[in-house]
Regions:
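Membrane-core helix-loop-helix motifs of multi-pass transport proteins
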Residues: 125-222, 382-419
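Long, contiguous bundles of hydrophobic transmembrane helices that form the permeation core
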Residues: 2-5, 9, 26, 32-33, ...
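Core transmembrane alpha-helical segments of multi-pass membrane transporters/permeases
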Residues: 43-77, 249-304, 329
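Short helix-coil transition sites and intra-membrane helix breaks within transmembrane domains
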Residues: 19-22, 55-56, 68-77, 106-118, ...
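Hydrophobic alpha-helical transmembrane segments of multi-pass integral membrane proteins
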Residues: 59-62, 89-124, 288-294, 313-350, ...
Length: 419
């Protein structure tokens, strides 16, 4: 069963590389593996579970709806022209700046998918308008989700590490904050190198700016696209307590209202645009995420993921390698390294003292490695969202982020386990 599953995974990767219809490839692969396992219902149950996942659907369709409102009110053009004119003069700082900006937002908006939806809809068009290749622009935002939520005391992974290490969230962060900051710099620098080698850091011609040469900027309209991000950051940091109650979708709706007030566009047209964008987001972005979950269910049905997790648990003598490689590979394969990180920490890290290892270091290593693996997965929700914003194949993003992810996971292991 394991070998059959691995062969199907390789075929799936090949089909994605050939740019066959992504949703169809993932769905067929997941169903075939489920059939081979003798339980086809796992694929159908995964489909149903995804369709009921309001926590995932809500921010995605709201962000895509808001993006469409920005388009019909032309608020996006005001921001794009305002920033693109300045960004073009930054040269080599364009790409690393986008990576670090996304990481900063991701620290507060800890959902990689939610952060990508909120930031990508705004920042990716700006980068493209400034001359960055679409795939590189999307990769910059995608790479920015490398793991900066590990600096947020309220992040779930922090709570788990604190629990198994019998410590506090603040102690966990104090122990690894320097690692997370170093990884941010490595991610930004490595992607910049890739951009320079491929010649994608400048020179891309975008029609976005062709008709804006004599454009008169309305600064209020230019601020509207940033309003939801400002609300979310001020709320999550506690700067404005009232905003703390707002979800991502709420901030997007407020942004739509602001677009109306700034432009006085017909409310009916804004309403139609919002739901058209929401529908497109569901069909493209969420559709791929749903099919990816069907694929993952097929992988699980053949026992591949459980086998990998069990191998890590059964070999505590190589816990350092297991905590790094296991969650990282599972992040790549499944698009999320959280399951492996949590399983490892609750099964192995809890015995760190017996193994002669530092529980805080081991727990953080597993959590960070899983996040880094996700930034190398073409089926990760945030990869799909960013690719959708740039209208490119998710695999094109991975080709650009892979170098940084691999370097970062090695550096993480060295810093937390050997230095």
């Amino acid at each position: 069963m394991l070998w059959i599953g691995l062969i199907i995974i390789l075929i799936t990767v090949y089909c994605l590389m050939k740019q066959y219809e992504t949703r169809l490839v993932l769905f067929i692969s997941g169903v075939v593996m489920a059939i081979i396992s003798g339980n086809i219902m796992v694929a159908f149950d995964a489909f149903s579970k995804s369709m009921k996942n309001a926590n995932l659907i809500e921010p995605i369709i709201a962000a895509m709806g808001f993006a469409m409102v920005l388009q019909i009110t032309k608020c996006d053009q005001h921001l794009i022209y305002l920033l693109a004119k300045s960004l073009k003069n930054l040269g080599p700082l364009l790409v690393p700046g986008a990576v670090l900006a996304t990481a900063l937002v991701n620290t507060s908006i800890t959902s990689a998918g939610g952060c990508s939806a909120a930031v990508g809809a705004i920042l990716i068009p700006v980068l493209i308008g400034a001359g960055v290749h679409p795939a590189m622009a999307a990769a910059a935002v995608f790479a920015g989700t490398y793991g900066s939520p590990m600096l947020n005391p309220g992040f779930g992974q922090i709570a788990i590490v604190a629990d198994v290490a019998h410590s506090t969230p603040i102690d966990v962060i104090s122990n690894h904050y320097h690692v997370v900051l170093i990884l941010g710099l490595i991610t930004a620098i490595s992607l910049t190198i890739v951009a320079f080698v491929k010649g994608e850091h400048k020179g891309y011609h975008s029609d976005t700016l062709d008709h804006l040469k004599d454009f008169k900027i309305n600064y209020i309209m230019a601020i509207v696209p940033m309003l939801p991000l400002i609300i979310l950051i001020l709320g999550s940091t506690g700067t404005v307590p009232l905003f703390k109650k707002f979800a991502i979708s709420h901030a997007m709706l407020i942004g739509c209202a602001a677009a109306f007030l700034a432009t006085r566009k017909s409310p009916a047209e804004i309403s139609k645009a919002f739901f058209k964008g929401a529908g497109d987001g569901f069909a493209t972005v969420f559709g791929i995420i749903t099919m990816a979950l069907v694929f993952v269910s097929g992988v699980q049905s053949l026992g591949i993921i459980n086998w990998m997790i069990q191998e890590m648990i059964n070999t505590p003598s190589i816990a350092k390698i297991s905590a790094t490689v296991g969650p990282f590979l599972l992040g790549v394969i499944s698009g999320s390294g959280e399951a492996a990180s949590i399983a490892f920490n609750q099964s192995v890290t809890i015995h760190a003292d017996t193994l002669g290892l530092n529980a805080l270091n081991l727990g953080s290593l597993a959590a960070i490695s899983g996040a880094l693996g996700r930034t190398m997965s073409p089926i990760a929700g945030c990869a799909i969202i960013c690719a959708g914003c740039a209208k490119v194949n998710p695999l094109e993003l991975v080709k650009r982020t892979a170098l940084g992810a691999i370097i970062c996971v090695i550096i993480t292991m060295l810093l937390l386990m050997y230095i």
